[in-house]
């Protein structure tokens, strides 16, 4: 959330951010409301001063026997009271409108962010792991076909149980997801992260604090009512990311300098209504309604946030390095930068099966497995999260950052395709074997029930 003062003093900076991020907000209306509100507050201060002066003279006039003048003062006091009430009511209305309007303004991109219209103008910063690729089959089978053949992914039963966009991981597929979650948590514990296991349901106030509401209502799962209905502060939603509950742990709190940097990690299932929109994303587990993810959230001093941002990128990368998966780092341009972010990098892993136009020369495609973001004070201001170095010092807003560490299903996709063998089995990455009871190769399972009879 941008402060009123910043918007008031930097309207052209805000206007440029709206253009660069493609956000349609009536900034002129916000500025007009702010100006009228300030004029009313000034008029209200004048009236309160006059009321106090008039009130102090009434007794003096009565004591002096000037009844007519005293009566005039009483009448003026009542007029001031009535006018002041009208002004305060109007000022409260404008302030409420202003607060809601400020929630619609996006974060200002950091000056280092490349300017661009859309994702085609994102900037690739580097690639890792392509100098020593393992040999993959000439025709890598897509994860969605291989997963069904090995009986470790079940899309039909996922749809039967919950509807389209859901899947079931079973057998070694389920073990692989569990292994990845525990492995990721262990890696980040080594990086001094503190574990959090938050509620899966979050209230509207929490969603607003991190910026999911009011802008992204249509993508969220609401527990009661429809997304089109008005919502109250305590209405519940299924969390779209652990960023929401973990950031809001310290909503309306003041941390101490000695607490910072404060680094949390949380595993949660995540729920989003954005499943499969086009192309190969309509198949498999690349884009689904429910998925597992480990999230890292940092609370830091403002002057340290951009250095910590680079550290957070490295902490997410460490998972990919240990899994020995090829990947690249992409910096988002202004047009592809999220509503809340000042700066963002995506970590994209290589999945070699499905060739896509924007994929690498080796074939296949890129899959985003982590977005690492610096929100600066944007979320902290919305959620009221401050810090002070010493007890006697004034509190100021801190900076928040987060990053996926990582999104589990897409790592499963990368493993099933990159570690695929000619015989249709999948080699388990060495780093994961201790988490899978020493299993080195996923060979699959027999089908159960009449489905294994095929067409018979």
Curated annotation (Swiss-Prot):
Residues 49-69 are annotated as: Disordered. It is found in: Cytoplasm. The keyword Hydrolase does not apply. The keyword DNA-binding does not apply. ATP binds at residues 272-274, 288, 368-371. One of its GO terms (cellular component) is cytoplasm. Pfam families: Seryl_tRNA_N, tRNA-synt_2b. It catalyses: tRNA(Ser) + L-serine + ATP = L-seryl-tRNA(Ser) + AMP + diphosphate + H(+); tRNA(Sec) + L-serine + ATP = L-seryl-tRNA(Sec) + AMP + diphosphate + H(+). Homodimer. The tRNA molecule binds across the dimer. Catalyzes the attachment of serine to tRNA(Ser). Is also able to aminoacylate tRNA(Sec) with serine, to form the misacylated tRNA L-seryl-tRNA(Sec), which will be further converted into selenocysteinyl-tRNA(Sec). Belongs to the class-II aminoacyl-tRNA synthetase family. Type-1 seryl-tRNA synthetase subfamily. Consists of two distinct domains, a catalytic core and a N-terminal extension that is involved in tRNA binding. This is Serine--tRNA ligase. It comes from Halorubrum lacusprofundi (strain ATCC 49239 / DSM 5036 / JCM 8891 / ACAM 34). The gene is serS.
């Amino acid at each position: 959330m941008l402060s009123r003062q910043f918007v008031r003093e930097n309207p052209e900076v805000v206007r440029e951010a709206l253009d660069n991020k493609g956000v349609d907000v009536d900034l002129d209306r916000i500025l007009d409301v702010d100006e009228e509100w300030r004029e009313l507050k000034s008029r209200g201060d004048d009236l309160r001063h006059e009321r106090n002066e008039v009130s102090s003279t009434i007794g003096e006039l009565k004591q002096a026997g000037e009844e007519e003048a005293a009566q005039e003062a009483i009448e003026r006091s009542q007029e001031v009271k009535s006018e002041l009430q009208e002004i305060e009511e109007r000022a409260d209305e404008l302030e409420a409108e202003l607060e809601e309007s400020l929630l619609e303004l996006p974060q200002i991109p950091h000056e280092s962010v490349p300017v661009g219209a859309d994702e085609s103008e994102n900037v690739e910063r580097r690639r890792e792991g392509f100098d020593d690729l393992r040999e993959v089959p000439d025709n890598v089978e897509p994860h969605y076909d291989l997963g069904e053949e090995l009986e470790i992914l079940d899309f039909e039963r996922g749809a039967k149980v919950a509807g389209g966009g859901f899947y079931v991981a079973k057998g070694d597929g389920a073990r692989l997801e569990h292994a990845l979650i525990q492995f990721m948590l262990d890696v980040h514990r080594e990086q001094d992260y503190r574990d959090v296991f938050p509620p899966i349901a979050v209230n509207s106030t929490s969603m607003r604090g991190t910026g999911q509401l009011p802008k992204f209502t249509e993508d969220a799962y609401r527990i009661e009512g429809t997304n089109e209905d008005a919502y109250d502060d305590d209405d519940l939603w299924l969390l779209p990311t652990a960023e929401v509950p973990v950031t809001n742990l310290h909503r309306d709190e003041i941390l101490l300098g000695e607490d910072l940097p404060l680094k949390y990690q949380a595993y949660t299932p995540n729920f989003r209504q954005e499943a499969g929109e086009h192309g190969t994303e309509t198949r498999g587990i690349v884009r689904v309604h429910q998925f597992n993810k480990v999230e890292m959230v940092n609370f830091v001093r403002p002057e340290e946030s951009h250095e910590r941002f680079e550290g957070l990128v490295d902490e997410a990368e460490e998972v990919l390095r240990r899994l020995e998966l090829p990947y690249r780092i992409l910096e988002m341009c202004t047009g592809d930068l999220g509503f809340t972010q000042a700066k963002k990098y995506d970590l994209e892993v290589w999945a070699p099966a499905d060739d896509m136009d924007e994929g690498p020369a080796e074939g296949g495609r890129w899959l985003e497995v982590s977005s690492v973001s610096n929100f600066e004070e944007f979320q902290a201001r919305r959620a009221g999260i401050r810090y002070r170095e010493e007890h006697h010092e004034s509190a100021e807003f801190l900076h928040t950052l987060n990053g996926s560490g990582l999104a589990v299903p897409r790592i499963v996709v990368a493993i099933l395709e990159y570690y695929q063998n000619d015989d249709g089995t999948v080699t388990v990455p060495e780093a994961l074997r201790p988490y899978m009871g020493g299993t080195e190769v996923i060979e699959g399972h027999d089908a159960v029930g009449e489905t294994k009879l095929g067409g018979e």
